[in-house]
Amino acid sequence: MRFAGKAALVTGGGGGLGLAIAEGLGREGASVAILDANPAAVEAGLASLTAAGITARGDVVDVRDPEAVRAAVDSAAHAAGHLDVLIAAAGGSLGTPRDLEDISPADLDLVIDVNIKGTFHCAAACVPHMRAAGGGSIVTFSSIGGRSTSPVTGIPYAAAKAGILGLTRRLAREVGPDGIRVNAIAPGLFLTGRLQGMFDAMSEHDRAEVLDSIPLRRMPSITECVDPVLFLASDQSSYITGAVLDVNGGRFMAG
């Protein structure tokens, strides 16, 4: 098992892709801590992990709060005795894209704070523990929205997810000498939770248009999203850092 004896922390781990990643880590031997801002999601996520026989703990944490993040990370690292993997999957958008004049400063702050600052706070809290352990792996979450000019992503989200790429590369350079690797994943549209409902509500024409924008002409399975994250987090990618892995069916090539 790729993560036997490893301790992993997953933000946004209460549901959707974050929970699926936590389950993947756990099934391959990791003890897992999930952080999520939604108390019900943390409770449900822990129940799911425990039912699968995975050693797990959870905390209700808003990643925009650096003190809360640090306290939760320190607690998880202390409980496991070390911390080896961070999956910074927490993020968010304004939902339906808005024109520039309809985006308030508060709207912009919300998206930047959750995505960029949240990722920064989590990395800042985890790196000291990884240094103490002699190394580690961090996987950040960009998006097709940070890699293309897709009109469905919105300006704040596109800016935030592009910023994640810069954060990833610069952090990778800084912590590389400590044996810590930092890589980004850039998923496209994957159908879990809210996104599944949005896709199902589209007309047949609109769904076909979405699929036509993807060179592979189909949506991914949840496993096709989880497996690349596990690859980047594992020693299978031990000589890869500062990279971005597109998991969007080639959609990033469309511009």
Task: Report residues per predicted region.
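Alpha-helical segment proximal to the catalytic Tyr-Lys
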Residues: 128, 173-177, 238
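Residue(s) in the substrate-gating loop at a strand-loop-helix junction
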Residues: 143
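Canonical Rossmann dinucleotide-binding motif of NAD(H)/NADP(H)-dependent dehydrogenases/reductases
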Residues: 2-33, 171
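Substrate-binding pocket helix/loop in short-chain dehydrogenase/reductase
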Residues: 97-100, 104-112, 206, 210
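Active-site helix of classical SDR
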Residues: 123, 160, 168
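The beta1-alpha1 cofactor-binding region of Rossmann-like NAD(H)/NADP(H)-dependent oxidoreductases
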Residues: 39-40, 60-72, 105, 223-224
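Short C-terminal tail/terminal secondary-structure segment
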Residues: 97, 230, 241-255
